[in-house]
From Swiss-Prot:
Protein name (Swiss-Prot/TrEMBL): Dihydroxy-acid dehydratase
The protein's required cofactors: [2Fe-2S] cluster; Mg(2+)
Cofactor: record remark: Binds 1 [2Fe-2S] cluster per subunit. This cluster acts as a Lewis acid cofactor.
GO biological process: one example: isoleucine biosynthetic process
Functional summary from the UniProt entry: Functions in the biosynthesis of branched-chain amino acids. Catalyzes the dehydration of (2R,3R)-2,3-dihydroxy-3-methylpentanoate (2,3-dihydroxy-3-methylvalerate) into 2-oxo-3-methylpentanoate (2-oxo-3-methylvalerate) and of (2R)-2,3-dihydroxy-3-methylbutanoate (2,3-dihydroxyisovalerate) into 2-oxo-3-methylbutanoate (2-oxoisovalerate), the penultimate precursor to L-isoleucine and L-valine, respectively.
Residues annotated for [2Fe-2S] cluster binding in this entry: 47, 120, 192
Taxonomy of the source species: Bacteria, Bacillati, Cyanobacteriota, Cyanophyceae, Synechococcales
Entry keyword annotation includes Magnesium: yes
Organism of this sequence: Parasynechococcus marenigrum (strain WH8102)
Cross-referenced NCBIfam families: ilvD (TIGR00110), PRK00911.1 (NF002068)
Biological or metabolic pathway of the protein: Amino-acid biosynthesis; L-isoleucine biosynthesis; L-isoleucine from 2-oxobutanoate: step 3/4; Amino-acid biosynthesis; L-valine biosynthesis; L-valine from pyruvate: step 3/4
Active site, renumbered: 470
InterPro entries given in the database record: DHAD_IlvD/Edd, Dihydro-acid_dehy_C, DihydroxyA_deHydtase, DiOHA_6PGluconate_deHydtase_CS, ILV_EDD_C, ILV_EDD_N, IlvD/EDD_N
Subunit structure: Homodimer.
């Protein structure tokens, strides 16, 4: 029995069938599985501009395989284009909108399965949230990574353009050089090319078995990506017939595998937020402390941007995520019994993958010679973050700094100070009231952090925030500080000049002010007025949970 029988079977469903006939159903089609294709196509961003072609390939393959595809649209927000503006407040919000849209369309139309096609950062976790909520057979198709831009023999990504702004203000390049970077950074379709958030989350989904092997590192414009979309539709139909559902795959071990791979490839801080959200929706007991536990045993073995040398297409050519997983599996750092949407175990999927990385590349290193001996996403706690915070310490020579606080109530004020060269070596920059409630929406601080790196201060200035960081960020940065300022977190009590210690070695984020003074400040603190009362941002601020629990809106704290 199919779920779609609810709208296709029986005399009383004659009106329903009448409408389905108008969109292409014939007599022979009413017993076929109805497969939703959640198409994230948009000309808003290069990440999604190629998704319509992929969705059409999947649609045709589904029909040829014996299913009845029904395509519908989802939205996207371009993180790169909205970065540094008020529009970035809508980025994390769009994750919930995408999840709600997919859930609404699939459940409203009694679909038997769904193929989600996405590109930009929030498309991936948004689709995964919907899949976990509905628990109908599902496959995710990643739109693919952009190829690197080229300038002067160097690979460029969009982060190169953000960093060039800081280089310009510090006098290291001129406006013509900045313009040259701008014109060459993004050469075509695809998601941002380093191991930034989109590529991190697609790697996580591949690891957890809800997308096909090698698919997360394919280039958007290569033919193999279109072939992958078609094959994914065939696999979805098989999953419907075999009744393989997302919650069969999204186990505690699968989340641990995803975290291990994210550490190994040097992935984005946003993976912490998104995996916590997906796990919570899937009913899996995952906490922020699990990331630290796994970090302690999984090294970084991939030399990828933003802090490394290579881009995601280089990782693909070196063997992709399966090669990374095989190394981890052989070292006992991966659960090989986890199932995939193809019905195979992860160990079976990796059986033919070489046990050592190719000798003619240095993108993927052996575990005996890692880039970093431990994972790069450290969970810091202390009186500034009693619920935890996430530090990205890749590319940092010494992840320890004690210095005076430079406090800003918004990203814009912080960026202005950096570009005016008012931030000096040794400073601890605090950007607050940018959390899930306070922002609302947890804006990403790529513009300030890139400007700091561009000015040569990446190792000598720390930036902490209750907001987020782009996957393109690196340096001594600490985000997701919880509790956030807007709900009374200690970050809201920091005053300019206070001493703050950021110590990733000791996993400490500490405001060096005595408890009596903090008690006095807390008594004088009052909850700030909401920045938005109506519209989606007002609604989001009222519903959203703490970042330490994934910042979800359908399961209040």
């Amino acid at each position: 029995m199919l779920r779609s029988d609810a709208v296709t079977k029986g005399i009383q469903r004659s009106p329903n069938r009448a409408m389905l006939r108008a969109v292409g159903f014939g007599d022979e089609d009413f017993g076929k599985p109805i497969l939703g294709i959640a198409n994230g196509y948009s000309t808003i961003t290069p990440c999604n501009v190629g998704l319509n072609d992929l969705s059409r390939r999947a649609e045709e393959a589904a029909r040829q395989a014996g299913g009845m595809p029904q395509m519908f649209g989802t939205i996207t927000v371009s993180d790169g284009i909205s970065m540094g503006t008020e529009g970035m407040k809508y980025s994390l919000v769009s994750r919930e909108v995408i999840a709600d849209a997919i859930e609404t369309a699939c459940n409203g139309q009694s679909m038997d399965g769904v193929l989600a096609v996405g590109g930009c950062d929030k498309n991936m976790p948004g689709a995964m949230l919907a899949m976990a909520r509905m628990n109908i057979p599902a496959v995710f198709v990643y739109g693919g990574t952009i190829k690197p831009g080229k300038l002067g023999g160097c690979d460029l990504t969009v982060v190169s353009a953000f960093e060039a702004v800081g280089q310009l203000t510090s006098g290291n390049i001129d406006e013509d050089q900045l313009t040259a970077v701008e014109k060459n950074a993004c050469p075509g379709a695809g998601s941002c090319g380093g191991m930034f958030t989109a590529n991190t989350m697609s790697a996580a989904i591949e690891t957890m078995g809800l997308s096909l092997p090698y698919s997360s590192t394919m280039a958007a414009e290569d033919e193999e990506k279109a072939d992958n979309a078609a094959r994914s539709a065939e696999v979805l139909l098989d999953a419907v017939k075999a009744n393989i559902r997302p919650l069969d795959l999204l186990t505690n071990d699968a989340f641990e595998n995803a975290i291990s791979v994210i550490m190994a490839v040097g992935g984005s801080t946003n993976a912490v937020l998104h995996l916590l959200a997906i796990a919570r929706t899937a009913g899996v007991s995952l906490s922020i402390d699990d990331f630290e536990r796994i970090r302690q045993r999984v090294p970084v073995i991939c030399d990828l941007k933003p802090s490394g040398r290579y881009v995601t297409v280089d990782l693909h050519n070196a063997g992709g995520i399966p090669q990374v997983m095989r190394l981890l599996l052989d070292a006992g750092l991966l659960h090989g019994d986890c199932r995939t949407v193809e019905g195979k175990s992860l160990r079976e999927v990796l059986a033919d993958v070489p046990s050592v990385p190719p000798a003619d590349q240095d993108v993927i290193r052996p575990l005996s010679n890692p880039l970093y001996g431990k994972g790069h996403l450290a969970i810091l706690k202390g009186n500034l973050a009693s619920e935890g915070s996430v530090a990205k310490i890749s590319g940092v020579k010494t992840p320890v700094l004690t210095g005076p606080a430079r406090v800003f109530e918004s990203e814009e004020d912080c960026l202005a100070a950096i570009l005016d060269q008012r931030i000096k070596a040794g400073d601890v920059v605090v950007v607050r009231n940018e959390g899930p409630v306070g922002g609302p929406g947890m804006r990403e601080m790529l513009a300030p952090t890139s400007a700091i790196v561009g000015q040569g201060l990446g190792d000598r200035v720390a930036l902490i925030t209750d907001g987020r960081f782009s996957g393109g960020t690196y340096g001594l940065v600490v985000g997701h500080v919880a509790p956030e300022a807007a709900v009374g977190g200690t970050i809201g009590l920091v005053q300019g000049g206070d001493s703050i210690t950021v110590d990733a070695d000791q996993l400490l984020l500490q405001l060096n002010v005595d408890e009596a003074e903090l008690t006095r400040r807390r008594a004088a603190w009052s909850k700030p007025e909401p920045r938005y009362r109506t519209g989606i941002l007002g609604k989001y601020a009222r519903l959203v949970s703490s970042s330490s629990r994934g910042a979800v809106t359908d399961q209040p704290d």
